[in-house]
């Protein structure tokens, strides 16, 4: 989601704007990185990117698709009231873990940069090791 990281990894990528993924929630996987998991009624906010073939290969390598760390899956996202098929990356390892040092700060900074809804940004910040990870607020879609 970070503009700076995407421009470094995928210089030909074009940001198409923010989008939502209904029926899924943000999680930190056992490896300490972000992923998504199905959850009826939940919603993930993020950024939709148009990638060149070279950028797609670069992001697949970065997400360790060939090694099996993440699985690439097409899901329907919503952007501006319209549905669109998008490639997502889902951690192979199920369950929840603790984020790696600095990871959540990076995610939250990017969420602020993209002006994602503040309740959602707060739900991301709760994943910080010092943050509270109990029941999430209903308005974030995390409570299920």
What are these regions (language model features)?
Residues 1-144:
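Glycine-aromatic micro-motifs
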